[in-house]
A protein has these predicted regions:
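Cleavable N-terminal signal peptides of Sec/SRP-targeted secreted and luminal proteins
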Residues: 1-12
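Generic low-complexity, intrinsically disordered sequence content enriched
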Residues: 6-8, 17, 68, 97, ...
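Extracellular glycan/ECM-engagement signal in secreted proteins
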Residues: 13-47, 99-177
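Short, well-structured hydrophobic secondary-structure segments
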Residues: 52-98
Length: 177
């Protein structure tokens, strides 16, 4: 009986809600052999892993914020460096639009026709995308890159690639962080 009581009170301490409006948050990938690697920026694209292992000179950890609880566009800024050092700020996270042949996710300061910067939602701490059709999807994948050891491209809606690994994106840091 004591064990159950301890478990119940310990689980009550863990927040299960989405980050609040204007609260900074990071995103972490969980999947096969991926126990909470962080999302980072490099050359305008989204990657998973340690930015220190990236070969890009613009690699930077990212913090996001939503301007309101109903906002489905997420604003990214460098986390841990000054905006001047990073060379970018206030970029929107995007998924490739359904008309795009590319699956790589990234960051943009102004949405182009082959990019979708809205529709990002939380289900608790799990990231989902509400599509134009009204369907909700979490079709996130990663593929190991030559960009650096332990660095993965963050992909959207990959259905025809054997090297892509399905993942979940969450706002929860791994317990070993």
């Amino acid at each position: 009986m004591l064990c159950l009581g301890a478990s119940a009170s310990a689980s009550a301490l863990i927040s299960r809600s989405a980050p609040a409006a204007n609260e900074k948050f990071g995103l972490y990938a969980y999947g096969e052999n991926l126990g909470g690697l962080s999302l980072f920026y490099a050359d305008g694209l989204a990657y998973i892993g340690d930015p220190a292992n990236s070969t890009s000179s613009t690699a930077s950890s990212v913090s996001f914020k939503r301007e309101s609880d109903s906002s489905s566009s997420w604003i990214a800024n460098p986390n841990g460096t000054t905006k001047a050092e990073a060379g970018w700020s206030d970029e929107l996270l995007y998924i490739p639009s359904s008309s795009s042949s590319d699956h790589q996710m990234g960051f943009t300061s102004s949405e182009r026709s082959n990019e979708t910067t809205s529709g990002f939602i939380f289900y608790g701490q799990w990231v989902m995308v509400e599509l134009e059709s009204g369907d909700i999807s979490s079709s996130f994948y990663v593929r190991e890159e030559s960009e650096g050891k332990g660095v993965y491209s963050l992909l959207w809606n990959v259905t025809d690639e054997e090297t892509a690994i399905p993942i979940s994106l969450r706002s929860v840091e791994p317990s070993n962080a």
